A protein has these predicted regions:
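A glycosyltransferase accessory/donor-loop signature
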Residues: 2-6, 10-17, 51, 161-318
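A conserved hydrophobic helix/loop-capping motif in glycosyltransferases and polysaccharide synthases
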Residues: 19-26
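Short amphipathic alpha-helical segment that frequently serves as the phosphate-/nucleotide-binding helix
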Residues: 30-38
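Short, acidic, metal-binding catalytic loop of nucleotide-sugar glycosyltransferases
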Residues: 39-47
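Short internal beta-strands
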Residues: 49-55
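Active-site-proximal specificity loops/subdomain of glycosyltransferases
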Residues: 58-100
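GT-A fold catalytic core of metal-dependent nucleotide-sugar glycosyltransferases
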Residues: 91-146
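Conserved catalytic core of nucleotide-sugar-dependent glycosyltransferases
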Residues: 124-192
């Protein structure tokens, strides 16, 4: 009997990486996803993009050529979108983990436009070695008092008492418009805790320091979950001079940086917040830029940012 030798070759599998967008509610959010996907594809042709919709058929009827700019679409279950028949965006975002299609996910709110190649941004996030990163604008400990200036959703003493937090906890303040999520035990635990707090122990809306379109803000519960798990969500150590996370997304409440400054130092320009929150200076710039980019490929810029910005959930109009 001849002995047959076998050799086993071990191949490393490269983790999948891509951008994840959420679009639900009014058609304007489909339009926003379309514009953002188009801008990413223009600057970063090899980056994978998945858009998660409440109603993919309806969404594609509004943006019929969207599939030219994305790789995949997904469907969000209605029970993760509505509470008592009312749209609940915070609920969608605390449920985000179970919908993530990649091993390494760059989640972006759709109210932004890429102004250059985002692959270096993804590379930097990957090389950080961290499993969860968000745009971090500050930290708070309860000994600093009740006013957590960087986190407008609730007073610090209210959060510490309501959630029975330890005095030693350090709470971050994130802007969840950008989240880097590596699937695994750490990220899963963060979202599991945030969901549990959101559904089973929420601060009553009437007691919130600031309202968000009549619903619960996901950032509040993500901040508490991060504090409980002792996780710093910042890409780099936060300082007062660098709250922009190393220049990834430009958020503006007033006119400041020039267009050149933004394109040199940031990857995306956001138009977050309600109508009038982001200065018209930047809104008009984005529309001009998109109009030129669409014209270059023989198309028209149909879904104007100026119109989308008038229909944001933050105003309770969604």
């Amino acid at each position: 009997m001849n002995e047959q030798s076998t050799s086993t070759t071990t191949q490393s599998i490269t983790p999948s990486t891509g951008v994840v967008l959420l679009a639900f509610g009014k058609p304007q959010y489909y339009w926003a996803a379309y514009n953002l996907a188009f801008s990413i594809r223009k600057h970063s042709p090899n980056v994978k993009i998945t858009v998660l919709f409440d109603d993919p058929i309806k969404a594609l009827s509004h943006c019929h050529d969207l599939m030219q700019y994305i790789n995949h679409i997904g469907h969000i279950a209605l029970e993760d979108i509505y509470t008592n028949k009312k749209l609940d965006p915070g609920k969608v975002k605390v449920n985000l983990y179970k919908y993530l299609p990649y091993d390494r996910n760059l989640y972006l709110d759709v109210d932004a436009i890429a102004v250059k190649d985002i692959q270096p941004m993804i590379d930097e996030l990957t090389q950080s070695g961290k499993d969860y990163i968000s745009h971090c604008v500050g930290y708070h400990t309860i000994d600093k008092g009740r006013d957590f200036k960087e986190m407008q959703w609730a007073w610090a003493d209210k959060m510490w008492a309501h959630f029975n937090l330890l005095e030693s906890y350090v709470m971050p303040a994130i802007n969840s418009s950008m989240q880097w999520i590596v699937k695994g035990s750490q990220a899963e635990a963060i979202y599991r805790t945030a969901k549990d707090l959101y559904f089973n122990n929420p601060i009553p809306i009437k007691d919130l320091r600031m309202k968000w379109g009549g619903g619960q803000p996901d950032e509040l519960y993500m901040n508490v979950a991060l504090a409980i798990h002792g996780i710093d969500p910042a890409l780099k150590a936060y300082t007062k001079n660098d709250s922009s996370e190393g220049g990834m997304i430009h958020f503006a409440m007033q006119r400041g940086l020039s267009f050149q400054d933004i394109t040199e130092n940031y990857y995306l320009q956001s138009y977050y917040g309600g109508a009038g929150f982001t200065p018209r200076f930047y809104i008009d710039w984005l529309d001009r830029m998109l109009a030129a980019d669409f014209k270059a490929i023989g198309k028209r810029h149909i879904y104007l940012i100026s119109r989308i910005a008038q229909n944001k959930y933050a105003d309770g109009k969604r």
